[in-house]
């Protein structure tokens, strides 16, 4: 099934997106090579937000931020795996990513903090990534 906005997703797909703990962010690096990164995320006001957190990274601007400055299109996938394959499902959001400076969007950071204890204890210092879906695709085995 496809949708244009988060509100158009079927209930099971929206619940998966809201309750999921880890997403996979697909983007393209400077050489044109596809990359997929696990990210934490939260849904807020029609967009999917992720933060560049305090986990160890190389010095300088994080690679994902560099890649998205160059090519701001990305795909984010949240899935549920089960050994009972009748329970398999996923939601994918494709769209443009905005890089929002640290401290410029306190509300999404609060939503991330409500979802992830580590963010409440030590808020992420880096920028926020705001993916605004242009297309959403969802699938589940039970249909």
Where are these regions (language model features)?
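Short solvent-exposed loop/turn micro-motifs enriched in small/polar/acidic residues
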Residues: 18-20, 33-34, 90, 122-124
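Short coil-to-beta transition motif at edge beta-strands of beta-rich domains
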Residues: 71-73
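Short beta-strand segments
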Residues: 21-57, 76-79
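Short, conserved active-site entrance elements at the starts or edges of catalytic domains
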Residues: 1-27
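Short gly/ser/thr-rich secondary-structure transition/capping motifs
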Residues: 57-59, 112
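Structural motif corresponding to alpha-helix initiation and N-cap regions
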Residues: 10, 61-62
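Charged, gly/pro-rich active-site loop segments
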Residues: 1-11, 81-143
């Amino acid at each position: 099934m496809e949708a244009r906005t988060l509100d158009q997703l079927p209930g099971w797909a929206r619940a998966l997106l809201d309750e999921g703990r880890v997403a996979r962010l697909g983007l393209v690096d400077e050489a044109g090579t596809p990359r997929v990164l696990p990210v934490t995320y939260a849904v807020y006001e029609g967009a999917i937000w992720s933060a560049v957190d305090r986990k160890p990274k190389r010095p300088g601007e994080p690679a994902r931020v560099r890649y998205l400055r160059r090519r701001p299109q990305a795909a984010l996938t949240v899935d549920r795996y089960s050994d009972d394959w009748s329970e398999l499902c996923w939601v994918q959001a494709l769209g443009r990513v905005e890089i929002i400076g640290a401290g410029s969007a306190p509300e999404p950071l609060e939503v991330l903090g409500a979802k992830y204890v580590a963010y409440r204890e030590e808020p992420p210092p880096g920028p926020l990534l705001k993916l605004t879906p242009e297309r959403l695709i969802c699938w589940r085995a039970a249909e």
